[in-house]
Amino acid sequence: RYAHIGTGNYHSGTARLYSDFGLLTCDPAVGSDLIEFFNFLTSGCQPKRRYSKILVSPRNLKDQLLAKIDREISKSSSRSPGLIRLKTNALEDPDITEALYRASMADVKIELIIRDTCRIRPGIPGLSDNIRVISVVGRFLEHSRIYYFRNGGNEEYFIGSADLMMRNLESRAEV
């Protein structure tokens, strides 16, 4: 069984303009999680099991991202500083924003690539000294969503379709 997780949509009209990433995998756990997710989409019934590999909104994505930010804070040390890298179209969610500020104040380095709206103000002494925000503007619309956590050397990478907006994290079904 093969599964594909992508960072955007499959709309043929925008495919020539958007740059996205995709993961083609034969990992049985990812495949099983995606079957459960599609069963939810087609039946409307809430899944009874927990996803083992994927993060899904509105079920667990936001809570898991907040937990990963908190974990980065707790694992960060002078010998092994924490690092969070996020690339999304927008960062509007107030809870994620607050968590990133907390991480910055705990000396976690945060690198954000945000194409559009961003609630974070980098470089504010005592609040966001450790946050760098850039926006990439070019010929192709940067459309990918990537979440990276150093996790004390046990690095984690996630890709998906959800931006860090309340509507994506709390209202829409997204992976």
Model-derived features with residue positions:
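Charge-patterned, long linear interaction tracts outside catalytic cores
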Residues: 14, 20-21, 38
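PLD/PLD-like phosphodiesterase catalytic module centered on the HKD motif
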Residues: 1, 6-9, 13-15, 24, ...
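Long, non-coiled-coil amphipathic alpha-helical linker/lever segments
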Residues: 34-60
